[in-house]
A protein has these predicted regions:
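Transmembrane beta-strand segments of Gram-negative outer membrane beta-barrel proteins
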Residues: 24-37
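Extracytoplasmic loops and strand-loop junctions of Gram-negative outer membrane beta-barrel proteins
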Residues: 33-36, 119-124, 168-172
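Short, flexible helix-coil linker/hinge segments at the edges of structured domains or between repeats
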Residues: 158, 163-173
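Cleavable N-terminal export/targeting peptides
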Residues: 1-27, 193-196
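Individual transmembrane alpha-helices with interfacial aromatic-anchor signatures
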Residues: 172-181
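Internal, hydrophobic beta-strand segments that form the core of beta-sheet-rich folds
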Residues: 153-155
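Gram-negative (and chloroplast) outer-membrane scaffold detector with strong preference
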Residues: 51-137, 142-148, 182-196
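Surface-exposed strand-loop-strand hairpins of Gram-negative outer-membrane beta-barrel proteins
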Residues: 36-52, 66, 73, 173
Length: 196
């Protein structure tokens, strides 16, 4: 985990020193993401929901790739569950004045991971899975200046299909609609323009 943090920090530092920020979006690159960490006596959870990089084809249309993960450690039972997602995204922005934007984003992700479950014999078992996740959601963006923005995800419509690789994990699907704790979030983005 320490090496991953060092790698991500190095990539961000290199990007910040080799490209300059600009207010114009067309031809620009957007970096965004949200890191979350939560710790209790029972364990801890680390996630990125998600980290992305996108290219502006015009002032309002952004296409790119994002990656998200969630790692949950249970201290009492001594296990860790992992979830990963990666895939393309498309977003469109509608200005609502000088400092506010309404953003719509859609994503199609490949997912994989491992989890621990209690099986029919009441025994803890672990297994791995893969599948896909389709998601659409609105965001409200607040321009902070010099290419920085604070973005709030306010709802979600998504479909997740999970295919088990092990008998201990059931094939499953999940539909998420509306507003709840898993569909609301804050993140930050930085728009950059590559020197020509």
């Amino acid at each position: 985990m320490k090496n991953l943090k060092l790698f991500l920090a190095s990539c961000l530092a290199i990007a910040c020193f080799s490209i300059q920020s600009a207010n114009a979006q067309k031809g620009g690159v957007m970096l965004y993401g949200s890191f979350n960490y939560h710790e209790t006596e029972a364990g801890h959870q680390l996630s990125a929901a998600p980290l992305g990089v996108g290219y502006f084809f015009n002032d309002n249309m952004n296409v790119g790739l994002n990656y998200g993960f969630n790692t949950s450690k249970n201290k009492a039972l001594d296990f860790t569950d992992h979830f990963h997602e990666v895939g393309p995204f498309y977003s469109n922005t509608w200005p609502l004045g000088k400092h506010f934007n309404l953003i719509g984003q859609v994503e199609a992700h490949y997912i994989w991971g491992n989890e621990h479950v209690v099986n029919a014999a009441n025994v803890m078992a672990d297994g791995s899975y893969n599948g896909y996740l389709l998601r659409a959601y609105p965001l409200v963006g607040i321009s902070l200046g010099k290419g920085w923005a604070l973005k709030a995800k306010v709802a979600e419509l998504s479909y997740k299909k999970k295919h088990s690789k092990d008998a201990s994990i059931a094939n499953d699907h999940e539909i998420i609609t509306g507003i709840n704790g898993s569909t609301v979030g804050l993140g930050i983005s930085k728009n950059l323009f590559i020197k020509g």
